Amino acid sequence: MDPRKVNELRAFVKMCKQDPSVLHTEEMRFLREWVESMGGKVPPATQKAKSEENTKEEKPDSKKVEEDLKADEPSSEESDLEIDKEGVIEPDTDAPQEMGDENAEITEEMMDQANDKKVAAIEALNDGELQKAIDLFTDAIKLNPRLAILYAKRASVFVKLQKPNAAIRDCDRAIEINPDSAQPYKWRGKAHRLLGHWEEAAHDLALACKLDYDEDASAMLKEVQPKAQKIAEHRRKYERKREEREIKERIERVKKAREEHERAQREEEARRQSGAQYGSFPGGFPGGMPGNLPGGMPGMGGGMPGMAGMPGLNEILSDPEVLAAMQDPEVMVAFQDVAQNPANMSKYQSNPKVMNLISKLSAKFGGQA
């Protein structure tokens, strides 16, 4: 199984333990049912969650949710991590040192000369002449640029000169040439320690000791390893927090999508009901309506094909009182009743709303008859 999915599941379970109300959301119903079907018991929702179920659910403020999520996340993973930085120095910014031409053709004479330069460089190093040692190792590298130990030796001098970035460049080159040599890892680990790169330092020093145990490298590994472990634990902590935050965000997105869908359904249902309310009138007005309304009005509202071409129809429908009456269920029920049987109009003689609409229609159509 994908380890990331396992971590996400672990983070979700932890979140559920901290806040069981998460399991009582509608989208988590399937999980509750499964747990109960297996004989398990879902913890009761918090009082807050129960009260929300008994009242109208308030829509979440997305901005507030985002602010809460951001508040949970520090500005950086190490913002609240305290590490002793004794011995850490500012990085060196010198131009890259000479590395020699790795494609150069090397003769035996050049190799002998390079070896002589190396011996002289080691003597200068033992005498404390560090810059002279650097220059001599550089001469040796230019003569034999494919010898890993020359880069490792020069890196050791750069570390003594407190130029960790230069040392790292030399060690990288040495490892490219011979990845099984312990010396480049040892000096690169020491360089990373000078820069406060605790995890990188621990990795390189551990590998150096694995390839060829060295007491000096082992002693420094014991110093940096606790700091590297502390950083790793801190990172895992915030990875779990990020995973929990991602789960919360996904739940929030599902919740918002469901609310949008439900709102769209409600709006569609309202439109359907509105269309049915103002739909076609059954049977038209057979035989004509009293008050000189022309007979045979085969439809109104959403299905008014018989009235579509009537002169003055737009004028009638633009009359606010007519529109208001057509939105009154009581008036429309009476209107349909009279449409089916004009004799029933007598029942509504005392209803001013119904008679007002009939009078307006009668006056309009009567005037154009």
From Swiss-Prot:
TPR repeat boundaries on the chain: 114-147, 149-181, 183-215
Organism: Pongo abelii
SUBUNIT field: Homotetramer. Interacts with HSC70 as well as DNAJ homologs and HSP90. Interacts (via the C-terminus 303- 319 AA) with GRK5.
UniProt cross-references to PANTHER family, sorted A to Z: HSC70-INTERACTING PROTEIN, HSC70-INTERACTING PROTEIN-RELATED
Main subcellular location of this protein, as a coarse class: cytoplasm
Residue numbers bearing the Phosphoserine modification: S346
GO BP field: chaperone cofactor-dependent protein refolding
PROSITE patterns from the UniProt entry: TPR, TPR_REGION
GO cellular component terms, A-Z: cytoplasm
One Pfam assignment: TPR_8
Family designation: Belongs to the FAM10 family.
Modified residues (N6-acetyllysine): K353, K360
Stated name of the protein: Hsc70-interacting protein
Function: One HIP oligomer binds the ATPase domains of at least two HSC70 molecules dependent on activation of the HSC70 ATPase by HSP40. Stabilizes the ADP state of HSC70 that has a high affinity for substrate protein. Through its own chaperone activity, it may contribute to the interaction of HSC70 with various target proteins.
Annotated stretches, region: Disordered: 38-97, 256-302
Source taxon at top rank: Eukaryota
Skewed-composition ranges (Gly residues): 281-302
Residue ranges of domain STI1 in the record: 319-358
Gene3D superfamilies assigned: 1.10.260.100, 6.10.250.3420, Tetratricopeptide repeat domain
Gene: ST13
Record carries keyword Phosphoprotein: yes
Subcellular location: Cytoplasm
Composition bias, Basic and acidic residues: 49-73, 256-272
Gene Ontology MF term list: Hsp70 protein binding; protein dimerization activity
